[in-house]
Design a protein with these regions (language model features):
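Beta-strand signatures of extracellular beta-sandwich domains
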Residues: 2-4
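Conserved hydrophobic beta-strand positions in leucine-rich repeat
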Residues: 45, 57, 66-70, 79, ...
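Consensus "Asn ladder" position of solenoid repeat domains
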Residues: 140, 161, 183, 206, ...
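Leucine-rich solenoid repeat scaffolds
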Residues: 236-307
Length: 307
């Protein structure tokens, strides 16, 4: 690997992996420098700093690159990963204060995508990413997102995109976890229709008025608190380890109907002090919380929490 630090010094590094703590260089004089890196053999790059100002971040052809991390960088408005790392498998791009455009459409071997805390990034266009299983894309400025070209997705975290109200998925998916808390969804009915394998859903702090999970027979974790729900439906006989639906608009009938749908928790054997699993529900701060039939939950051995 060869680095031109832009001040007349050129540094050659035979084995970058032997540099404990990475490559560190300190300039004698404050100013703007054009840094160039030649490293076709590199498989990993991690460029991180405390709001390191990089106004023209360009990386040349690195066909063996497998992992890329760019964090805490300012002044970079556009980032094109299509040409320099077509075989990258993992990207971690976070806290780029000025990033407005990101191009990754040709990175077809991506398995893990992490793009977070980029407040000026309002859209992402995905190409064909048939191997991507996890997407962590929180704290950006997104208002809509299409994931139709990511057929292998299993875990999605889009939390805290405060303007996000639209998400497109393939009709049939293997998604097991969706985290969209702190967004602006008014309905996620179309999303749930595509996710029959869903096990975990976190959709708290949105604008939902109805939530129907009756088609998600494997659901085991549900956090839907701080919405405007007047109706909440879960599969008959559901055993959710956590069901948090407090701070909504559920009346007495809606809560009793929900309680009736929940499964029976088996009492632990006398010789075994506690159940291997505990099933918890919170429903306080709902209009029907005081008048609902809590005995239904007691008879089914559910644990009631106040949040």
């Amino acid at each position: 690997m060869v680095i031109d630090w832009g001040n007349g010094r050129i540094q050659k590094i035979e084995d970058p992996s032997s540099m404990t703590g990475g490559v560190v260089y300190r300039y004698g004089n404050k100013g703007s420098y054009e840094v160039k890196i030649w490293a076709e053999e590199l498989q990993l790059i991690d460029i991180s700093g405390l709001l390191l100002p990089l106004s023209n971040l360009y990386l040349g052809n690195m066909p063996r690159m497998k992992s890329l991390a760019l964090n805490s960088i300012s002044d970079t408005r556009k980032l094109d990963l299509n040409t320099f790392c077509p075989n990258v498998e993992s990207i971690n791009i976070g806290r780029l204060a000025d990033l407005e455009r990101l191009e990754i459409g040709n990175c077809s071997r991506l398995r893990s995508i992490q793009i977070y805390s980029n407040p000026k990034l309002t859209s992402i266009e995905f190409g064909s990413h048939p191997e991507t299983e996890s997407l962590y894309c929180s704290y950006n400025g997104l208002s809509s997102l299409s994931l139709k070209n990511l057929p292998a997705l299993r875990n999605i975290d889009l939390s805290s995109n405060e303007r996000l109200s639209r998400l497109e998925l393939n009709e049939e998916t293997s998604i097991s976890a969706i985290l969209i808390q702190g967004c602006a969804f008014q309905s996620i009915t179309d999303i749930l229709k595509c996710c029959s394998s869903l096990r975990e859903l976190s959709c708290s702090y949105n604008k939902l008025t109805e939530l129907d999970l009756s088609g998600c027979s494997n659901i085991s974790e549900l956090r839907c608190e701080h919405n405007q729900l007047t109706r909440l439906m879960v599969p008959q006989g559901s055993l959710l380890e956590h069901l948090y639906c407090h701070s909504n608009q559920l009346d007495e009938d809606a809560l009793n109907t929900l309680f009736d749908s929940l499964g029976q928790v088996v009492n632990p054997a006398i010789y075994y002090p506690t159940s291997l699993r505990q099933y918890r529900i919170s429903f306080n701060d709902n209009p029907g919380a005081d008048d609902c039939n809590r005995s239904i939950l007691n008879d089914k051995n559910w644990i009631v929490e106040n949040k």
